[in-house]
Amino acid sequence: MSETIYALASAAGRAGIAVWRLSGEGSGTALSALTGKPLPEPRRARRVRLRDGAGEVLDDGLVLWFPAPHSFTGEDVAELHLHGGRAVAAALTARLGELGLRPAEPGEFSRRAFLNGKLDLTRAEAIADLVDAETAAQRRQALRQLDGGLAGLVEGWRSALVRAMAHLEAVIDFADEDIPDTLLEQSVGEVRSLRREMEVHLDERRNGERLRDGIHITILGAPNAGKSSLLNRLAGREAAIVSAQAGTTRDVIEVHLDLGGWPVIVADTAGLRDSACEIESEGVRRAADRAAKADLRLCVFDGTLYPNLDAATLEMIDDATLVVLNKRDLMTGETPASINGRPVLTLSAKAGEGVDDLVAELARVVESRFAMGSAPVLTRERHRVAVAEAVAALSRFDPGLGIEMAAEDLRLAARSLGRITGRVDVEEILDVIFHEFCIGK
């Protein structure tokens, strides 16, 4: 008999309603003890008064009963919809402890759902992603994964490998029988096609992971080009210190933004220049490091200096760069249409002019570079590692070198894919996955 657990499934703190969840074989007994009544009709809310061991009323609320296996965890589950006060929470947890229930660990409800076959690992991860989603794009991706898109893709690959394994095993075990000569050729063709499909997903520039974790945009430029002022405009607050003194920014300053539904992390960096100051030089080194790792770069120039622009910043311009001429309110003369082959946007970070145009262009570029449509994508590093291992095994697949070895390569590939959904022994990764969860999930 597994332990019966409980947790607050809604947000902690003072609230109009608090939802408590119980799961395990003792849930029904605990619910009856709290209400002093028989269990309610399954999946129908009942208003009751909950009482402590001495019969004193704890609260007046709604209770629901979900008998196994028709529940989220696959176990007997009870939900208590009570008032969200601290006194109610303290009295309830004390009573649940008296009844032999223990507090749930983070992710324990979802872990039990997985172990009882209610969720595969990708859907369990999708629940965590949906809870953590801060933008519309993150929400949509989590819902697609929760709907089984990624699980269906991976299981389709795995099923195809199992069929190919069966064909090879037939050739091995029934060599004396009348096995069609085309069976082996068919399997080789299917395996090669599968490998190419997996490689396509590995080549997607980690877009699913970027969407989960945030798309990194780094602001680069010479000292006093207006990088910090631009960051503050984008953030809508004073995130960075703005000063007429060159070299004020010496460390990387990050702000998290919702850019048209896309999660982005914009980083302001130290001005690109040689400096005798050890601290400032370290800031410049970090700026170059962030630029190399960024998904997009904003190269900001002091427009009043055009055409004598900073050489170090010009060297940073590539296809993943937006070029910005700042201080357009002070500029004279014609504005160039492009610099180093990249279109130019002009703005005044100090006055706020042109910033909306930059935001719109950033959103357009992000959408064009990272949009994934409705197709399932790999959303975690562990997914990518597993698919890469499968591709490596399939790259070795060659029945001409021995059918037994070829069958083993297929088994290794199928096992790697099985780790994504949990179709193999994955006890070693469960703790890592479910540790990311909220307590009541």
Swiss-Prot record:
InterPro entries: G_TrmE, GTP-bd, GTP-bd_TrmE_N, GTPase_MnmE, MnmE_dom2, MnmE_helical, P-loop_NTPase, Small_GTP-bd. GO terms for biological process: tRNA methylation; tRNA wobble uridine modification. SUPFAM superfamilies: P-loop containing nucleoside triphosphate hydrolases, TrmE connector domain. Its cofactor is K(+). Mg(2+) binds at S228, T249. Keywords: Cytoplasm, GTP-binding, Hydrolase, Magnesium, Metal-binding, Nucleotide-binding, Potassium, tRNA processing. Residues 214-367 form the TrmE-type G domain. One of its GO terms (cellular component) is cytoplasm. (6S)-5-formyl-5,6,7,8-tetrahydrofolate binds at R21, E79, K118, K441. The keyword S-adenosyl-L-methionine does not apply. It is found in: Cytoplasm. Binds 1 potassium ion per subunit. Homodimer. Heterotetramer of two MnmE and two MnmG subunits. Belongs to the TRAFAC class TrmE-Era-EngA-EngB-Septin-like GTPase superfamily. TrmE GTPase family. HAMAP family: GTPase_MnmE. Exhibits a very high intrinsic GTPase hydrolysis rate. Involved in the addition of a carboxymethylaminomethyl (cmnm) group at the wobble position (U34) of certain tRNAs, forming tRNA-cmnm(5)s(2)U34. This is tRNA modification GTPase MnmE.
